[in-house]
């Protein structure tokens, strides 16, 4: 009977140790994921800055993510080039205005 209790105690100890190692690995993976998200957030393109080379890299605004808005520019040489900047689309501006107005009225 004593041998069975020793074996059971040993198994419980091994299982708890291995599960705690797994939890530590999960916590480390979550930490790395959060650090990667923070790095991505730091690398986003601010509002009103050029996004021609990275059209999906605009930062978030107050409520919505800024969109890369492009226009065709004609240079003095007559060449047409596309220039893009991160901005807030008109329908997002209207929604932000309504929400801001609602916050002022209803506190």
UniProtKB/Swiss-Prot annotation:
Keywords noted in UniProt: Disulfide bond, Knottin, Secreted, Signal, Toxin
Q: Which InterPro entries match?
A: Spider_toxin_CSTX_knottin (IPR019553)
Q: Which cysteines are joined by disulfide bonds?
A: 44-59, 51-68, 58-86, 70-84
Q: GO cellular component annotations, sorted alphabetically?
A: extracellular region
Signal peptide, first to last residue: 1-20
Entry annotated with the keyword Disulfide bond: yes
Propeptide found at 21-41
Where in the cell? Secreted
Spell out the molecular function terms from Gene Ontology: toxin activity
On tissue specificity, the annotation reads: Expressed by the venom gland.
Q: What free text does the record give on domains?
A: The presence of a 'disulfide through disulfide knot' structurally defines this protein as a knottin.
Family indicated by similarity = Belongs to the neurotoxin 19 (CSTX) family. 04 (U1-Lctx) subfamily.
User: Under which name does UniProt file this protein?
Assistant: U1-lycotoxin-Ls1m
Organism of origin is: Lycosa singoriensis (Wolf spider)
């Amino acid at each position: 009977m004593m041998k069975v209790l020793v074996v059971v105690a040993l198994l419980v100890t091994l299982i708890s140790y291995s599960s705690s190692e797994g939890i530590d690995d999960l916590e480390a993976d979550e930490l790395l994921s959060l650090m990667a998200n923070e790095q991505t957030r730091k690398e986003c393109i601010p509002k009103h800055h050029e996004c021609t080379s990275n059209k999906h890299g605009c930062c978030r605004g107050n409520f919505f993510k800024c969109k890369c808005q492009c226009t065709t520019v004609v240079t003095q040489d007559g060449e047409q080039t596309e220039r893009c900047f991160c901005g807030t689309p008109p329908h997002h501006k209207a929604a932000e205005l309504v929400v801001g107005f609602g916050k002022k009225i209803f506190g």
